[in-house]
Amino acid sequence: MKSIKYRGYRRTISEYTKRASSLPTVHETTEINITGLREFCKENDVTLTAVIIKVLASVQKKHPLSNSFIARNIFLRKTIYLPDEVDMAVAIEMHAFDSHFSTIVVLRDINRKTVREIGSEIDGLRHLTYTQLPLSGLTTLMDRLPDFMKSIGLGIVSQIPALRQRLFGTMGFSSLGKYGLKSFDTLFYLNVGYGIGGIEEKVILKDGSVQTVPTLTITQTSDHRIVDGAEAARILAEIKRIFESGEYKTILKV
């Protein structure tokens, strides 16, 4: 029987996902007609991923709870913090140590970046090695610690607002549509995370005629301690409206 070492990075992932899975989450899914969006991306030579990230970040202005987290204040009381910046934690797949695994990189201050800058940053990060990623020194140190010290370290970081935002980000993004998945739930130690599924051609009835349109499925996972089900639904409905109404064109800086 073949065996694989349970390396430090796997143990770090384990500690992170333990904390993420402990959150009381609510999951909501919507399908979005992206006919206009697909044409927009082609005409402007921008990636769909970068456009989606930019739009998700923009929703924070109308729904600030979509970009928030719980940590301790100076009196050690739990407090909901609402950062001014949207720091998007993006899950990417890495190959290192003879293994494939997911890791998280944080894109800083999304609302200040253009779609092309976001796309270029993601593309650049995907071509880096594990040890070249931002904050790789800290993650390498975490990988070397015993499990109980990893748990203590993550616990301390999660309760200090500035450190939490810097290391974990404020909003999560994962895209697995290219593997044929329609929808999936994300596992981020964050208040809100988005799972982007694949694009499907769907038949709809519009203006008395049958039409085929491309649809994209987005699943939103929210921390129920901060975002109630109704508010989560409003956030997701706003995202759908922006995409289908074409309002994203006024939001995006190409």
Feature names for model-found ranges:
Residues 1-254:
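C-terminal catalytic/motor cores of large multi-domain enzyme assemblies
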